[in-house]
Amino acid sequence: SANPTGPLHVGHGRGAAVGSSLANLMLAAGYDVTREYLINDAGNQMHNLALSVNARYLELFGKEVSFPENGYHGEDIIVTARRIKEKYGDKFLHMEETERLSAFQTLAKDEKLAALREDLEAFNCKFDVWFSEQSLHDAGKIKEAVDTLQKKDYVYEKGGALWFRSTKFGDDKDRVVIRDNGVSTYFAADIAYHQNKFQRGFDRIINLWG
């Protein structure tokens, strides 16, 4: 998977090519294979995408804005803002910022995801399922996964946060699943995603990281 916040880079392409080749080999060997793309469409990176597009959009109307500290500085963000202006004009200028950011996050995500699909198809890398990380949050699957771990005593509280006992499984340190502000981590979402995979009937999962 790659975050739908910008173009694919070489590392993404390498992972996609390796995964696609593995899937093709296993299909040729007679295995039942599902090629799934996890869309990382939740969390801070998506919020930073919305903030970045918001800044570029406002600049197009002559507004003086400070660019977000952790924003995306690529030319593609400017292009996205221009397309939004061309299609919607000044519609979003008159919205509350929260509403405008929500709209920009959706519009930018859809555009970036379409570009990712196009790039992947260009070198014949196909996916059967496009799975949204946000859908796990919306369905309460993150909490469900953490609750499951707590019942098995794999999670403990320290410093107001919830920690997964990953050292029991060979990790060099335990990992936070719920921060002290109550917000789940990407690690918690990954756990929920894998639990969801097994709930959907998969018995073997090959992950391509990076």
Where are the language model's segments positioned?
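NTP-dependent nucleotidyl-transfer catalytic core
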Residues: 1-210
